[in-house]
UniProtKB/Swiss-Prot annotation:
Name assigned to this protein: Peptidyl-tRNA hydrolase
SUPFAM superfamilies xrefs: Peptidyl-tRNA hydrolase-like
Subcellular location: Cytoplasm
Keyword Cytoplasm: yes
InterPro entries: Pept_tRNA_hydro (IPR001328), Pept_tRNA_hydro_CS (IPR018171), Pept_tRNA_hydro_sf (IPR036416)
GO cellular component terms, semicolon-separated: cytoplasm
Annotated EC: 3.1.1.29
Primary site of residence: cytoplasm
UniProt site (Discriminates between blocked and unblocked aminoacyl-tRNA): 13
One BP annotation, GO: rescue of stalled ribosome
Keywords for the protein's UniProt record, in alphabetical order: Cytoplasm, Hydrolase, RNA-binding, tRNA-binding
NCBIfam families: pth
Catalytic activity, reaction form: an N-acyl-L-alpha-aminoacyl-tRNA + H2O = an N-acyl-L-amino acid + a tRNA + H(+)
Length: 196
């Protein structure tokens, strides 16, 4: 059996002006999971974020959306993980992924940061440990690296947003499978999904 996941983090920038930007795609998953489980995320200053707690398949799962800026996300994750004695390999971080198209989401265990500042800070604050799970929500790529900053901080057009929402919803459903049956079964489900 794979290591149980005890903390799901949705990476985001704080404030209403960023709420619907592509860079906040990870947070949408946590918000949707909280909604499905009828839990209100509460601001918790000592964890530098919005937190909640749900039960998935009989397992306790803490939710966190850091309210730091993206490049300081690790501070919130490390604070909560330390307090509840959650190991890096019991953490899943949901984030926007330039290398996947909108409508696609994938689970992954371990790996580098791929230039994502939220992941970079998380790895650093977890003592350079890269063993946490990732939930990659595809947002597509603007085509040129110079356009990336504007792209991730921009809002998706309506049709594209539908694809992003559908992938986030499917990721939430697949998370149940991951917690119950492990990573490979969850990957089989999520990785065959593509919103059209």
């Amino acid at each position: 059996m794979t290591q149980p996941i005890k903390l799901l983090v949705g990476l985001a920038n704080p404030g209403p002006e960023y709420a619907k930007t592509r860079h906040n795609a990870g947070a949408w998953v946590v918000e949707e999971l909280a909604r499905v489980h009828n839990v209100t995320l509460k601001n918790e200053p000592k964890f530098f974020g919005l937190t909640g707690r749900i039960m998935v398949n009989g397992q306790d799962l803490r939710l966190l959306i850091p309210t730091t800026f993206m490049n300081l996300s690790g501070k919130a994750i490390a604070a909560l993980a330390k307090f509840y004695q959650i190991k890096p390999e019991e953490i899943m971080v949901a984030h926007d992924e330039l290398d996947l198209p909108p409508g696609v989401a994938k689970f992954k265990k371990g790996g580098g940061h791929g230039g994502h500042n939220g992941l970079r800070d998380t790895i650093s604050k977890l003592g350079n440990n890269k063993d946490f799970y990732r939930l990659r929500i595809g947002i597509g790529h603007p085509g040129h690296k110079d356009k990336v900053a504007g792209f991730v901080l921009g809002k998706a057009p309506a049709k594209e947003q539908e694809l992003l929402d559908a992938a986030a919803d499917e990721a939430v459903r697949s998370l149940d499978i991951l917690i119950k049956d492990g990573l490979s079964k969850a990957q089989n489900r999520l990785h065959t999904f593509k919103a059209e």
